[in-house]
């Protein structure tokens, strides 16, 4: 950790799949060095025709570019989220411009939850819970501890994100939550 004023930090994104629902929650904080620049950024959004939800961690402009590219792949391969993500990952890894983009994405539809990285990885977590970003591991641990409780996917996501926000200085409680029937 440095106090370099150009060092952007932030974002916690968490996905919880439980009880016929899939939820992606993201915090709203964007930090530059040790300064909070924005507290209400929207890092989670629906894609396609609303049948896919996604969240990003990383540089905002990079993530917006990747969201646009992913939406194009979803349109190109309707109903085939994994294929659309693999095609995006191929482009991300091989395209001269795209490979410089620094972001991680979680993408989910009614059937799958996938993590996309700039290394060309498309990972499907073995459990229905995954976290990315500066507070991702805190949120992930909290959600795993809560998953067997009598709570909905959204309740678990909100509680876990609250726990992450209480630990990670780059995460706040201003949440954006999107959900789908799974």
UniProtKB/Swiss-Prot annotation:
Keyword Cell inner membrane: no
Pfam families the record matches: Proteasome (PF00227)
Compartment(s): Cytoplasm
Principal location: cytoplasm
Enzyme nomenclature, EC number: 3.4.25.2
Gene Ontology cellular-component annotations: HslUV protease complex; proteasome core complex
Keyword Cytoplasm applies: yes
Residue sites binding Na(+) per the record: 165, 168, 171
Record key words, sorted: Allosteric enzyme, Cytoplasm, Hydrolase, Metal-binding, Protease, Sodium, Threonine protease
Catalytic activity: ATP-dependent cleavage of peptide bonds with broad specificity
Regulation (activators, inhibitors): Allosterically activated by HslU binding.
Catalytic residues (UniProt): 11
Classification via InterPro entries: ATP-dep_Prtase_HsIV_su (IPR022281), Ntn_hydrolases_N (IPR029055), Proteasome_sua/b (IPR001353), Proteasome_suB-type (IPR023333)
Record text on subunit structure and interactions: A double ring-shaped homohexamer of HslV is capped on each side by a ring-shaped HslU homohexamer. The assembly of the HslU/HslV complex is dependent on binding of ATP.
Family of this protein: Belongs to the peptidase T1B family. HslV subfamily.
Role noted for this protein: Protease subunit of a proteasome-like degradation complex believed to be a general protein degrading machinery.
Full protein name: ATP-dependent protease subunit HslV
